[in-house]
Design a protein with these regions (language model features):
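Short, cationic-aromatic polyanion-contact patches
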Residues: 3-6, 57-76
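Pre-recognition alpha-helix immediately N-terminal to the DNA-recognition helix
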Residues: 5-12, 91
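Glycine-centered, phosphate/nucleic-acid-interacting loop/turn motifs that mediate DNA/RNA or nucleotide
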Residues: 50
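Short beta-strand "wing" residues that participate in macromolecule-binding interfaces
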Residues: 54
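Amphipathic alpha-helical dimerization/coiled-coil segments
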Residues: 75-115
Length: 117
């Protein structure tokens, strides 16, 4: 399941720990300027889509991510790679290297990962 940019912002918070609506609002307001109502709307949609779940304790809802982080990241990466580079990993890495976006340490790490079995 592909996530929207807004869904990524919320689920990244929830992968760290379960949060209440007020905690999410505080965590996201500085970065996004979203109101409590905007976050409620997004959370309701995410619950319907199975991205987020919640447990009600009295009047408080505790929201948690319902999807696996690694699977979501892999799906997003694969989609980006296919859409932008036609699935060509070499072209992606070549473009990153040419744009000076990779540090020497990152290049060494990439080399180590490629050489692993």
């Amino acid at each position: 399941m592909r996530l929207t940019d807004s869904e990524w912002k919320i689920v990244n918070c929830l992968w760290k720990k379960p949060m209440t609506l007020m905690e999410l609002t505080r965590a996201l307001y500085a970065k996004t300027g979203w109101s409590k109502q905007t976050i409620i709307t997004l959370l309701n949609r995410m619950v319907e889509k199975g991205i987020v779940t919640f447990v009600q304790e009295g009047r408080t809802k505790w929201f948690s991510a319902a999807i696996d982080r690694t699977e979501a990241e892999l799906e997003e990466t694969t989609s980006f790679l296919d859409k932008v580079y036609g699935g060509n990993v070499g072209l992606l890495i070549s473009n990153l290297k040419c744009s000076d976006k990779l540090t020497k340490e990152q290049l060494e790490e990439l080399k180590r990962i490629i050489e692993e079995d």
